[in-house]
Design a protein with these regions (language model features):
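Conserved beta-alpha junction segments in alpha/beta enzyme cores
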Residues: 1-262
Length: 262
């Protein structure tokens, strides 16, 4: 597995299925960009190269290395062996084609799905403070920072969530991406189940809620949602039973209170 640099951490089953989720933002007859959020520890150069090769076979030069971005949610409970650098595949005892192939397949399929569902719409952005969802994993080390530096911040961790909301002109909201800094380590180093960890679970809860809400007004919609932990730092998930519910409720609040359109 990929996550704790532990050769003894060998997958024995699946906690829940991993997903690749994509949005394409395009101008009519103009520029476009693809953003893929992958339920994996990280993306890899060799994965992107292979994905671009497949997209070029299907779409020509429409999608290239310049307008396709692939990002991982940083789960520490995902499959290993799909990166091209030795240091990252030592604990999986080398390159694992099974991991690599299924990741490439999933990314390719989600981009094709997004391409085939391009529709006119708008993008909104919002920010808010989410409390009690994570803690500093080394508060004592944080205190070694100069006092003047620490006084600039209210907390010893970043508690700001940024959320992009995608709205179809006809259907209304169809999905979101968000950035919130917490580490994907709720599943410990003794875990042997493939999992999207806290960000993957939060995304699935969000999708279930979104699909149930959306089914009231449409028969068939593809929803793409995901928590995107790019500001990871030293923040670890806070351990309490209602943390996922807290995060989901906060997402709902953000989705309902957009004030800025881009």
């Amino acid at each position: 597995m990929m996550g704790y640099a532990n050769t003894g951490q060998i997958a024995s089953g699946i906690h829940f299925r991993l997903r690749a989720r994509a949005f394409i933002v395009a101008e009519p007859k103009g520029n476009r960009v693809v953003f893929v959020n992958l339920d994996a520890c990280m993306a890899s150069q060799i994965v992107k190269i292979k994905v671009i090769e497949r997209l070029k076979e299907r779409y020509g030069d429409l999608y290239t290395e310049k307008n396709v971005a692939i990002s991982g949610i940083h789960t520490h409970a995902g499959p290993g062996g799909y990166l091209q650098y030795v240091v990252y595949i030592v604990t999986s005892f080398g390159f694992v084609h099974q991991s690599f192939d299924v990741i490439v397949d999933g990314i390719e399929k989600c981009i094709i799905q997004a391409h085939e569902n391009l529709r006119p719409g708008s993008i909104f952005v919002n920010k808010g403070e989410l409390l009690d969802a994570g803690v500093n994993r080394s508060p004592s080390a944080y205190l070694n920072n100069p006092a003047a530096e620490r006084r600039k911040y209210r907390y010893n961790v970043d508690k700001e969530m940024t959320l992009l909301k995608f709205v179809d002109d006809d259907w209304g909201p169809v999905g979101s991406f968000n950035w919130f800094p917490t580490h994907g380590t709720s599943m410990s180093r003794t875990n042997s189940l493939i999992s999207g960890d806290n960000k993957g679970a939060a995304a699935r809860f969000m999708e279930d809620w979104f699909e149930q809400k959306g089914s009231e007004r449409m028969d068939s919609v593809v929803f793409e949602d995901e928590g995107l932990p790019r500001r990871i730092s030293n923040i670890i998930p806070r351990r309490h039973d209602k943390r996922m519910l807290l995060m989901l409720c906060f997402w709902m609040k953000l989705l309902a209170s957009f004030s800025t359109q881009i």
